[in-house]
Amino acid sequence: MAHIRAPTVTIPLLPLPKQTVLLPGVVQRVAVSSTRPDIASLLAAVYAKAASQTPNGRIDTIPIACVPLASPLIGPEGHLLIENGDDKTETADDVDPAKATKADLFPYGVAAKITGVEGRGTGEFTLLVEGVTRIHVEKVISDKAYLEGKVSSYADPALITDAALEELFMSLKLLSRQFVTILRLSSLLPQSSGTPGLSPLLARRLDFYIAKQKYPGALADFMANIVESSYEEKLEILTLIDVKERVAKVIELLDRQITNIKNSMRVTTITATTLPFPMDPDAAKHGKIKPPVKAPGHGAGMPFSPQGGFMGRGGNADEDQEPNEIEELQKRLDAARLSPEAAKVADREIKRLKKIHPAQAEYAVTRTYLETLAEIPWTTTTDDRLGPDTLNRARKQLDEDHYGLDKVKKRLLEYLAVLRLKQAINDDVDSQIKQLEQELGVASESSKEDAAQSTPIDLGVDEKAKAGGDKLEALKSRRMVDKSPILLLVGPPGVGKTSLARSVATALGRKFHRISLGGVRDEAEIRGHRRTYVAAMPGLIVQGLKKVGVANPVFLLDEIDKVGGSSIHGDPSAAMLEVLDPEQNHNFTDHYVNVPIDLSKVLFIATANSLDTIPAPLLDRMETIYIPGYTTLEKRHIAMRHLVPKQLRVNGLDESQVSFTPEVVSRIIESYTREAGVRNLEREISSVARGKAVEFADAKDSGHPENYNPQLTVDDLEKFLGIEKFEEEIAEKTSRPGIVTGLVAYSSGGNGSILFIEVADMPGNGSVQLTGKLGDVLKESVEVALTWVKAHAYQLGLTQSPSENIMKDRSIHVHCPSGAVPKDGPSSGISQAIALISLFSGKAVPPTMAMTGEISLRGRITAVGGIKEKLIGALRAGVKTVLLPAQNRKDAKDLPQEVKDGLEIIHVSHIWEAIRYVWPDGQWPSEHDYPSIESRL
């Protein structure tokens, strides 16, 4: 490539110290001492010229020529004088730079600028000179205080127009980066090896400079200054005005230096192999790679890997040589059967990976990303066990694992039935597609033979093939697409939501993975981090898919109601919208993977304790199934069937050594636990089992095992569990006016009981006193009941005239026992009204009759909740008859048969109807006697 020569100019000449060569783009320090008066004079002249030519007196605008001393071993044009080198009696070391003449100077040098002057505090200082461009000394015109001469400069071309130079430039870059890498790795060797080292920070800076350099001449000069070379070789490079020749020379020096470093590494028992870059100019030009060089013997050190790292200890290079990791990665990606979008991205990243040096941080990032793509199950699925016995097997599995929970089981069996029918349809469609493809294949072969034998074109064959293709596409469109439901199980803790999801996976024969969402506050935990972040990784969904290795697992999203809200880290609940939307999750995009992933085959089952904290858009995407707390009967069944055998086994006992009766379990449930689930019940059973284990061990160790009684009675519970923690109300044998038995369901869920409503009157001014730690709603129920009784006191026979106030000169006190327990809710309205009527009329309510329901000012009895728990508690307390709102008739149908048989359930819709059932002997008006105007709009 032709160089650009500038006109001749006159500038000061600075002879460089011995064995020193300054190249363009390089900064050099030149010491100014008493032995170099010429430099002081030159610097004074530069300052004077700068002061006269520039406003600020900047000395870096005044050029000088830095010229090295000549060498007797090299000619003026850079040719090595081998033939007469031995005849030279004077060497460059014998020349004093301060007294150098034109004959002592090398013809080539560098035009430079003085970038700074550093003082040392001892009277000496140092010049900082930066090379700018090559120059040729044409003539020395002054040699008084300092040298001055006429020089011509040569500038490198700005554009690369030669293909050969461009290829050499790429080879120079590869070798330069290899050189930096091997210097960095050599720093890990013992210092006694003599191999130069390189800090990680400097290595990264050099690697960045090499990658960003656009000019081959500048990079060649820079690397020539770094690489180890002789004084004469540097002079030769200084004379190479042609960029192509200069780059080739530096490639030669780099190749030699790399070889020397590798040999040094071998001496320190490091088994080396050839790096995957060209090692000589010819190989660099043609892109060839030398074969690996076997290390002598079996080194005990760490062999150097072709990928730029270290391999394991021991063995030689041939034994420890691993397969090319890029090829292995390509095989894994091919085996993963990526989606079209993922395959396109993987191909692009593989090409990038081949161009990235293994020592670069980007190499590890790209490799990790490709490994993640290979580990995601794009098409791998678990075959669902959907045979003729699918529903029976699943029903049996769910019944064995969980007692009750009929609504959940019903929904899951519906899903299995739909899945089974869809699979049958798809199997039939697949057989038709296969048959049609075979027919089209035979027709295609015959058409090819006919076309080879006959010249005319048969248009009928094309029409037939087109019709067959249309039919094939129509058949493929008939395939049923499975969209798994997204279920939300809502219920109190300990009712089996998590274990139910695991049973579903077992019944389906699918893999199961649990994702805990409690406390997740960062959107990136769901969607993953961008690859641009340090230590980025995919989100919980993609990590779960990688772990199970199939595209159709059962994912349990545990505690979805406890996901953090919107913050500076994003909104994780909003990130779940795409995951849990059946219409969108077939194209779920993780920030790290950044490729659409199909989640439509995943069966998501979420759990929550409450719906209050779940955002409405997220709740709308899930099918909510409520799991109420277990009743006492259900707890007893679960304990006898699951918990007792489990705890006996855990504590080293068997059923013959401890006998739990249903009565004992019922007492533990009623008197020692009050919860919706069975976790505390299991703990109490475990405590009893441990106590019996101590008794059995003592009897066995004493040699009198016959003294041990395996039978467990109700009276033994206080010894193992202490005094009873909860007391159950029992229906009284006798009754008195003003006392009514109400029903209550505990807020913990699963338990219910009776609650006495006590009303007393006293002389007063019509005030009402409420006690028993009653809530606001319960207080309002008392006010509504009292208002209705006062309004209908004349019809009830409580006053002599309609205008008489029954509360005149009277005050009442309403109390609910268990005053330390908070009570609230509207369900005691009917009980309050009946209790007030009983007090004012002096008629007692039957003690074995209980009631629940909300009352309105019109006297209507409206529906309440917790019917199942309340009635089970009523039966346990000895109640015989229960008054329920007519609107709760549907809830009574779901009661256990034991409750239906043990209670007389009466449904009432108005307070007058309830009064007639409570006191059937009285003459009471009907609610129809007091018609009301109601809007039907």
Curated annotation (Swiss-Prot):
Quote the SMART domains the UniProt record gives.
AAA, LON
Q: Kindly state which reaction or reactions the protein catalyses.
A: Hydrolysis of proteins in presence of ATP
Q: What EC number(s) would the UniProt record show?
A: 3.4.21.53
Residue span, Lon proteolytic domain: 734-921
Q: Where is the active site?
A: S827, K870
Task: Kindly list the positions annotated as binding ATP.
Answer: G491, P492, P493, G494, V495, G496, K497, T498
Q: Where is this motif: Microbody targeting signal?
A: 935-937
* Keyword Cytoplasm recorded: no
One BP annotation, GO: protein targeting to peroxisome
What InterPro entries does this protein's entry cite? AAA+_ATPase (IPR003593), ATPase_AAA_core (IPR003959), Lon_bac/euk-typ (IPR004815), Lon_lid (IPR054594), Lon_proteolytic (IPR008269), Lon_Prtase (IPR027065), Lon_prtase_N (IPR003111), Lon_prtase_N_sf (IPR046336)
- Write the record's keywords in alphabetical order, separated by commas: ATP-binding, Hydrolase, Nucleotide-binding, Peroxisome, Protease, Serine protease
Q: Lon N-terminal domain location, by residue?
A: 11-258
**Matches recorded under PROSITE patterns:** LON_N, LON_PROTEOLYTIC
Q: Which NCBIfam families does the record cross-reference, listed alphabetically?
A: lon
User: Family per UniProt?
Assistant: Belongs to the peptidase S16 family.
- What is the official name of this protein in its record? Lon protease homolog 2, peroxisomal
